[in-house]
Amino acid sequence: MPLPPILYEDSTMVAFDKPSGLLVAPDRWDKTRENLMGQVHAAMGRTVANIHRLDADTSGVLLCAKSKPALDFLSGQFQSKHVRKIYHALVVVLPVEQAMKVVAPIRTEEGSLPDAFTVDLALGADEANPGRMRVFRRRGGKACLTEFRTLERFTAPDGRRYAWVECRPLTGRTHQLRVHLAAAGAPILGDRFYGVPEVQLRLSDLKRGYKGRADERPLLDRLALHASELEVTHPESRIAHRMVAPLPHEFEVALKYLRKFGAGSGFVGRRPPRR
């Protein structure tokens, strides 16, 4: 298979726009599954190594190093949390009575997500569900912190609420954004592990009087999480370097119809301060 689009490349590093559904590295149990690093090694040689990972279902910026010195320098930034990562997610805002059953529901008095909020909950492996993570309220797990900003809010004709959210993980745990949003009562649309599988955003859910066909597909038939931006210090210039992955077409379509048919209230504010 051809390589995903290259967002940036020089002699020290290369950034790809990873599509949803593609593993970053070989699967532990099924070595035959297609993965990005297998494609990269076949096309660019085995000296290229990924600095970090994205979930298979998450799209967006994936950075690789082209040499051992670059790998060590960039990996050190991730380990010391000196990178800036921005994700975007379309979330299902659970009704208040349903949200109260989750770990740490976050709501305004009107029952919507606040303009900005922070989730500070430790995460660890969910032994009852292999391959998944869970929140640890008191003991156990590893410290985990995420800042969120609500960019837009939407209400479908049936009353179901959605929100377009900017996510800034300040730690880098497995499934961090997915678990933190679910814990806040706003699981990511299309999340088969931590979400609400019965909620599938279709045009017929938004457009009054429109009756879709029996085989109508969701507007966004995937995990609605995209790694939009990654900023690191360049291995050679030592200057901050930002890489941006454009929003996938299916996100643009879903947002277009939500803005057109969903009663919403946008929010434009300053980004949280850099750290």
Where do the language-model regions lie?
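RNA pseudouridine synthases
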Residues: 1-275
